[in-house]
């Protein structure tokens, strides 16, 4: 590698919104805040966060249900 053209690759303290803290290496700086990590992401935990889709579906049906009704 050429000297002086690459950013410094330093140890970074990463903090997740769930409270998990760990260290990795990055060129972004010395502190990094992230939204999800391997301890809180649904893919890794196997737990799905349930959204209020039932309420949304019902709201949609109330607003636009009359268009699909046959007479």
UniProtKB/Swiss-Prot annotation:
Single Gene Ontology MF annotation: structural constituent of ribosome
Cofactor: Zn(2+)
Protein name: Large ribosomal subunit protein bL31
Keyword RNA-binding belongs to the record: yes
Protein role: Binds the 23S rRNA.
Cross-referenced PANTHER family: 50S RIBOSOMAL PROTEIN L31, CHLOROPLASTIC, LARGE RIBOSOMAL SUBUNIT PROTEIN BL31A
Gene responsible for this protein: rpmE
One Pfam entry name: Ribosomal_L31
Keywords: Metal-binding, Ribonucleoprotein, Ribosomal protein, RNA-binding, rRNA-binding, Zinc
GO annotations of cellular component type: ribonucleoprotein complex; ribosome
Family in the record: Belongs to the bacterial ribosomal protein bL31 family. Type A subfamily.
Sites where the protein binds Zn(2+): 16, 18, 37, 40
GO terms for biological process, alphabetical: translation
Superkingdom classification of source: Bacteria
Species in which this protein is naturally found: Pseudomonas putida (strain ATCC 47054 / DSM 6125 / CFBP 8728 / NCIMB 11950 / KT2440)
């Amino acid at each position: 590698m050429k000297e002086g053209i690459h950013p410094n690759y330093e140890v970074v303290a990463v903090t997740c919104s769930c409270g998990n803290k760990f260290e990795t290496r990055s060129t972004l700086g010395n502190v990094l805040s992230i939204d999800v990590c391997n301890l809180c992401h649904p893919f890794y935990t196997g737990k799905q966060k349930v959204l209020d889709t039932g309420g949304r579906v019902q709201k949609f049906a109330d607003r636009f249900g009359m268009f699909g009704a046959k007479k």
